[in-house]
Amino acid sequence: MSLFQPITTHTAYIPGANNLGIVLTDDGGAIAIDTGLDRDTGRPVRRALDEAQRQLRAIISTHHHADHIGGNEYLVRNLSNVAVYAARLEAPLIEHPLLEPIYLSLGATPPSALRTKWLMAKGVPVQHIIDGDAIEIAGTTLEIVALPGHSIGQIGVAVDGVCFAADGFFGPEVISKHGIPYAHDVAAQLASLERLAMRKERFFLPGHGELTPQSELDAAIRINRLAIERAMHAVRDALTEPGDTLTVARRVQRALGLTITGLPQYAIFVAAVAAHLSHLELTGAAMLMMTDEGAIWRGGS
């Protein structure tokens, strides 16, 4: 049985904890949209291409998070002439993945616990920077959908009736498991949800979750929006008393009943809380003040 799960004539995917998109080109090639966490997710891509007798022409990395680019190095090293495409603001972090644990370590050299494959993939050169709203690869035109928010310059890809939405939205089962969707920019994340809700493709594939037909998209978007708003309310409620970022994060964790077992998960959670604090400050709902106890957050108007 083929590893490819067909979606439409020219699209397919390899399902898993990370869904990997495949675009089939008319010249007998293929384009991979994200490659998963590591070589163990890169290998099925290679095997599926071999089974289908197709050559990998390119990888489009939707954003720099390790669970989306970790298979890049394996595929680039083992296959010939594979070009990597990424958005301008994502490319430096794809080429230099140490930057991800650095920013999760407040800009410091990251501790060893944050230098694992969960946060730091192996880097590869990005040959093509995506700046516009469409690109052509191997004779196939792909629409680029701006989906910032989860990361600084995340993109989706639309082709042949399918929108590969990366982490622009999550499947409902993923939301219920993790509680607070990770965000770099909460306002941009909400705007990207609205942008997805307006699209008319027949199918939408999230990076994590089930393939979603157009008829079920509104419900999925609503669940994502509610999860973001729930997190925002929890952060705002945590400001009934002043506190630094870590104190606020502890309050939010308790309020949401989240169990955090590892340092990578904790670093990601604290960064998400910090994104919500920044959003509240920018909208006048929180204040950041320097005190004798350090940088302290307080509720705003």
What are these regions (language model features)?
Residues 39-135:
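Active-site HxH/HxHxD metal-binding segment of metal-dependent hydrolases
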Residues 10, 23, 34, 49, ...:
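Divalent metal-coordination and catalytic microenvironments
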Residues 12, 31, 60, 85, ...:
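Hydrophobic/aromatic beta-strand patches that form the interior of the parallel beta-sheet core
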Residues 37-39, 134, 141-232:
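Metallo-beta-lactamase
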Residues 2-52, 156-168:
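Conserved beta-strand hairpin/beta-sheet module of binuclear metal-dependent hydrolase folds
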Residues 237-301:
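C-terminal regulatory/interaction regions
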